[in-house]
Amino acid sequence: MTTGGFDLGGLDIGALLAQAQSVQNQLEAAQNQLAESNFEGTAGGGLVRATVTGTGELDALTIAPEALEDTDAETLADLVVAAVKDATGQARAMQQSLMPQMPSLGL
């Protein structure tokens, strides 16, 4: 097939555009699903809990009162970081699990 002097090799532009629109719609649905999801990470046997959104934004941080009694500041900071990393890791895993479901355009 030639268009304006270019050989498109039988490429169906209409089908390609329809497939691109379908991929865009699926990507938007996946992004919405992530935006509505929350992921909780824990550290120190549950002494510290962090909740992040599907986009990785920290939404909540809970520190058990006993963590304040029995833990020095440096250890507590390490537990907070570990809980946040746990939660963001779960969000990232969900993001990656949704992306392979996206069809390719077959170019």
Swiss-Prot record:
The keyword Transcription does not apply. It holds the Pfam family YbaB_DNA_bd. The keyword 4Fe-4S does not apply. InterPro entries: YbaB-like_sf, YbaB/EbfC. GO terms for cellular component: bacterial nucleoid; cytosol. One of its GO terms (molecular function) is DNA binding. It comes from the Bacteria. Keywords: Cytoplasm, DNA-binding. It is found in: Cytoplasm, Nucleoid. Belongs to the YbaB/EbfC family. Homodimer. NCBIfam families: DNA_YbaB_EbfC. Binds to DNA and alters its conformation. May be involved in regulation of gene expression, nucleoid organization and DNA protection. This is Nucleoid-associated protein PPA0205. It comes from Cutibacterium acnes (strain DSM 16379 / KPA171202). The lineage of its organism: Bacteria, Bacillati, Actinomycetota, Actinomycetes, Propionibacteriales.
